[in-house]
């Protein structure tokens, strides 16, 4: 837990820096995508914590201290706790990322307007004093690159965490808890249900 607190403090200090955030960065986080890679290293901690929870729940259910139905509320609560601990701290960058996205869209839209206007006048309105041929010109590729840059900014996230990371954390937090199903449902019934789901029945 101490290392986690240190990491939160590190994130807080980083967001106070004058960061050079690039809205067209391919990580869709203006260059902060490396933070997601760091957070992936918390996966073993999540698995271990879930295993501890699973052991405690199994003992309480087996001894009659807790009913199985209590898991219907406890499991979502555990996932929510993990989200607060490992995902929510990244929201500290949301304001800066949002400002970077808005600034990038504004700047690139202005540049795109000028470029498209010049492209239209040159190739569609005949204002081509150099007599350049369309075949082999780099203008069309530049127009496509500009379009890709604008799309990249539109897809930019306001937190340096992808949907893949969030889903991965949810899955690995649930996996250690799955054996608890055996306390209520026979193994063959569970396997049969899974096969029916996979086969679409």
Residue ranges, per PLM feature:
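Intrinsically disordered cytosolic tails
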Residues: 1-201
């Amino acid at each position: 837990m101490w290392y986690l607190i240190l990491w939160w403090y590190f994130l807080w200090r980083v967001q106070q820096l004058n960061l050079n955030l690039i809205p067209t960065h391919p990580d869709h986080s203006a260059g902060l995508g490396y933070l997601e890679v760091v957070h992936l290293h918390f996966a073993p901690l999540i698995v271990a914590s879930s295993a501890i929870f699973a052991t405690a729940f199994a003992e309480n259910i087996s001894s009659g201290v807790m009913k199985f139905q209590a898991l219907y509320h406890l499991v979502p609560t555990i996932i929510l706790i993990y989200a607060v601990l490992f995902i929510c701290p990244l929201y500290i960058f949301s304001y800066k990322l949002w400002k970077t996205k808005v600034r990038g869209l504004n700047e690139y839209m202005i540049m795109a307007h000028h470029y498209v206007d010049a492209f239209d006048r040159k190739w569609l309105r005949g204002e081509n004093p150099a007599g350049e041929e369309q075949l082999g010109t780099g203008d069309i590729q530049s127009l496509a690159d500009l379009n890709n840059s604008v799309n990249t900014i539109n897809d930019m996230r306001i937190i340096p965490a992808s949907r893949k990371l969030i889903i991965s954390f949810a899955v690995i937090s649930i996996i250690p808890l799955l054996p608890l199903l055996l306390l209520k449902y026979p193994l063959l019934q569970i396997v049969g249900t899974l096969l029916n789901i996979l086969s679409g029945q």
